[in-house]
Amino acid sequence: MSSIKSLTTRQQEVFDLIKRHIESTGMPPTRVEISKELGFRSPNAAEEHLKALARKGVIEIVSGVSRGIRLLTDIEEPENEGLPLIGRVAAGEPILAEQHIEATYQVDANMFKPQADFLLKVYGQSMKDIGILDGDLLAVHSTKDIRNGQIVVARIEDEVTVKRFERKGSVVYLHAENEEFEPIVVDLTQQPYFEIEGIAVGIIRNNAWM
């Protein structure tokens, strides 16, 4: 068995879910059950995390079996594994898939409330009026529980944007905090791929968190 490597926050959640499911039911969960429990868009997202866990040597995937997951080791949650910096993301893929992680910053996720799950580099001046500036690293808490008025990280196709969230019925408005920018309007009945990845919980600027 390969040596254990530190897990990302999301990978730890998947591992813990598998362990709990085995302890409570005597069998591992299916990809569909993992997706439903952790709020993934599809079982394919769960599969990507399972493959990452297998590469890190903490589970074994048995091919051709819906519950073909076997734990290879028990692990403790790391005290401070750092936060992944997310780069360009392809539509339909999990934002925390390994191929999207450009670097890892040794920042304690618990410095932010709620806890941060990843970092996203800010490009442009669309949010400058509330102090989110070009080049900042935005700390993001992964959640689908969004309220109007919150600063969110949204994905439209393969574009990731940081804006203030407002929803009216089936229409979402993503507002800039700069009068030079018009809001982005998303009709949920027409847009084939739109997803909220999380909420902003802090900013890192010049190695200082804010």
From Swiss-Prot:
<dbReference type="Pfam" id="PF01726">
    <property type="entry name" value="LexA_DNA_bind"/>
</dbReference>
<dbReference type="GO" id="GO:0006281">
    <property type="term" value="P:DNA repair"/>
</dbReference>
<dbReference type="InterPro" id="IPR006199">
    <property type="entry name" value="LexA_DNA-bd_dom"/>
</dbReference>
<keyword id="KW-0227">DNA damage</keyword>
<dbReference type="InterPro" id="IPR036388">
    <property type="entry name" value="WH-like_DNA-bd_sf"/>
</dbReference>
<keyword id="KW-0804">Transcription</keyword>
<comment type="function">
    <text>Represses a number of genes involved in the response to DNA damage (SOS response), including recA and lexA. In the presence of single-stranded DNA, RecA interacts with LexA causing an autocatalytic cleavage which disrupts the DNA-binding part of LexA, leading to derepression of the SOS regulon and eventually DNA repair.</text>
</comment>
<comment type="subunit">
    <text>Homodimer.</text>
</comment>
<keyword id="KW-0068">Autocatalytic cleavage</keyword>
<dbReference type="GO" id="GO:0006260">
    <property type="term" value="P:DNA replication"/>
</dbReference>
<dbReference type="GO" id="GO:0003677">
    <property type="term" value="F:DNA binding"/>
</dbReference>
<dbReference type="InterPro" id="IPR015927">
    <property type="entry name" value="Peptidase_S24_S26A/B/C"/>
</dbReference>
<feature type="active site" description="For autocatalytic cleavage activity">
    <location>
        <position position="163"/>
    </location>
</feature>
<dbReference type="Pfam" id="PF00717">
    <property type="entry name" value="Peptidase_S24"/>
</dbReference>
<dbReference type="InterPro" id="IPR050077">
    <property type="entry name" value="LexA_repressor"/>
</dbReference>
<dbReference type="InterPro" id="IPR036286">
    <property type="entry name" value="LexA/Signal_pep-like_sf"/>
</dbReference>
<keyword id="KW-0235">DNA replication</keyword>
<comment type="similarity">
    <text>Belongs to the peptidase S24 family.</text>
</comment>
<dbReference type="GO" id="GO:0009432">
    <property type="term" value="P:SOS response"/>
</dbReference>
<dbReference type="InterPro" id="IPR006200">
    <property type="entry name" value="LexA"/>
</dbReference>
<keyword id="KW-0234">DNA repair</keyword>
<dbReference type="InterPro" id="IPR006197">
    <property type="entry name" value="Peptidase_S24_LexA"/>
</dbReference>
<feature type="DNA-binding region" description="H-T-H motif">
    <location>
        <begin position="31"/>
        <end position="51"/>
    </location>
</feature>
<feature type="active site" description="For autocatalytic cleavage activity">
    <location>
        <position position="126"/>
    </location>
</feature>
<dbReference type="GO" id="GO:0045892">
    <property type="term" value="P:negative regulation of DNA-templated transcription"/>
</dbReference>
<keyword id="KW-0805">Transcription regulation</keyword>
<keyword id="KW-0742">SOS response</keyword>
<dbReference type="GO" id="GO:0006508">
    <property type="term" value="P:proteolysis"/>
</dbReference>
<dbReference type="GO" id="GO:0004252">
    <property type="term" value="F:serine-type endopeptidase activity"/>
</dbReference>
<keyword id="KW-0378">Hydrolase</keyword>
<feature type="site" description="Cleavage; by autolysis">
    <location>
        <begin position="91"/>
        <end position="92"/>
    </location>
</feature>
<keyword id="KW-0678">Repressor</keyword>
<dbReference type="InterPro" id="IPR036390">
    <property type="entry name" value="WH_DNA-bd_sf"/>
</dbReference>
<dbReference type="InterPro" id="IPR039418">
    <property type="entry name" value="LexA-like"/>
</dbReference>
<keyword id="KW-0238">DNA-binding</keyword>
<protein>
    <recommendedName>
        <fullName>LexA repressor</fullName>
        <ecNumber>3.4.21.88</ecNumber>
    </recommendedName>
</protein>
